[in-house]
Amino acid sequence: MPGRRRRVFPVVAAAFAIPVVLVVTGVGDGRVASANSSGQTQIAAAPITMRILLPGVGLERGLQVKTILAERAISARFPEITEIGGVRPDGMKWHPEGLAIDVVIPDYSTPAGKELGDRVMAFAFQNADRFGLVNVIWQQTYHPIGGKAHRMADLGSDDANHYTHVHIATNGGGYPNGTETYAD
């Protein structure tokens, strides 16, 4: 699976950059109105706090925006993940069209590896709307949004059966144009 291994420098840089908080002053639901001593109404925007998500451990080239968001959020949430595959040739549309990532699970065959994969899958479902989640495949089981999970046919290897990685497919949201901000 193509992906990028986590390097020491980006991890150290991220340790300083990820905690940075962007404060956005909005005009929507965050507005607060109050009357001053002269009876005039003053409107102040309440700050909305978002954490900017830096590029994660996966290669983003060719991924669509919601898939990038999922990749970055998973990279930020799970520092033990060191490889995420993205665009690659495949007979189905998901990877070639930038609609899916493969989150490689270290020591996938151990209880700790299974537990990590389960947490990654749960995180994807907790953020289903945000990520435009379509389905997750983990440990030979297909989990569609709004449908019943079912066991897949044996495809012959741990990799093909999705034991080595959690496959996360999104509806994409279109290709990035360079003006996107990815945030929690």
Where are these regions (language model features)?
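N-terminal Lys/Arg-rich, disordered targeting/topogenic segments
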Residues: 1-3
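Intrinsically disordered, low-complexity
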Residues: 5-84, 170-184
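Solvent-exposed, acidic/flexible segments
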Residues: 56-67, 93-96, 110-118
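Sec/Tat-exported extracytoplasmic proteins
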Residues: 74-82, 107, 127-131
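Hydrophobic/anchoring residues in structured secondary elements
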Residues: 83-86, 138
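Short, surface-exposed glycine/acidic/tryptophan-bearing loops
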Residues: 86-104
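Catalytic cores and adjacent binding grooves of peptidoglycan-active enzymes
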Residues: 108-184
